[in-house]
Amino acid sequence: MRPIPFTVPYSEEAVADLRLRLGRTRWPDSIPRTGWNYGADLDFMKDICRYWKDRFDWKKCVEEISKFSHFRCTVQDIGIHFILEKGKGPNAIPLIITHGWPGSFLEMLKIIPLLTDPAKHGGDPAVCFDVVVPSLPGFGFSDRASQPGMNTFRIAELWAELMQELGYKRFAAQGGDFGAAVSTILGLRYPERMLGIHLNYIPGSYRPALQPGAKLPEIEESFLRDADQWYVDYGGYAHLQRTTPQTLAYALNDSPIALAAWIIEKFRDWADCDGDVEKKFSKDELLTNVTLYWMTETIHSSCRLYFEGRKAPLQFQPGEFVRVPCAIAHFPKEAPFPPRQWIERGYNVSRWTEMPRGGHFAAAEEPELLARDIAQFFGALNRADKNDLYKK
């Protein structure tokens, strides 16, 4: 089905219901002076609740979101929401950017204008992009899957068809978190259609094809130990979402404060903010993302992607290798990040950038740094590329 324009919905009734629920929150106790040691801080969450109930303006947020061009397109019977903003130049490079969890397409709003209109924002006017930012199935305004199996491999297939439907025979891909997995699979499964891929995260399930019993260098063994320890110390959320997301859904889909605590804790822990999440994200930014999950009732369907990922991890089979050019942008406060040689076992790494600051939510935290790296990488590939199929 051809893409059709989409209007971001707004409901006064839904806002009234949200405020009623916030006002009736049944608060737990907490051990005094423990802050975030046991999870989301009680005083912080009470402050967030007051702001959300009394001052947060969802209608204004919808108006801001609606300044972008939104569409929906049915791909393999799944309705996919996406933003499409055309580049302000004659040779715009098609670029699909995929978000992760617990983010949404909202993560990319700051970076879109930097890529579509670089001349206006101090970038190289010769390198601009047609930017496509879809919502993953089960997130935001995209449909939820009605059958098991909606994993990152299937999503990459949907994205390839979506870009074909938009008229892009060849394109570039970028992503972090689940978006890094989807972009990797696009490079792995559709190399003839890819100009290259740019990643600011390496999926935790990634394993290159290794010989049975292969002895790894200590730097790689050390990384794998650190990653395992990270999941022991900080991965409780992931274990629940990988194993029993439906059980978690009854709490998060019913209580807005439970939902906010579940999501905002991750922004605090994963961003480069030294434990003060409002150093990087305003209350409005945090709550716009949480409210999107609340209004669309998609927290449980988004968590299912972890369940599906456990059954379909990014483990390369013998002979599998991402041969298209790949750029890695390493932000220093990201979760345990593999050494370059571990990544190069599975990827054709042609650019590696050590960023001076930033964490897991790179597009939202450091849009200028990320946009510059994306433009430099794909701009160079575009100049060197002899195949014009990436253009419409």
Q: In which residue ranges do the predicted regions lie?
A:
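Alpha/beta-hydrolase active-site loop
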Residues: Q147-E165
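The serine-hydrolase catalytic nucleophile loop
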Residues: W101-P113
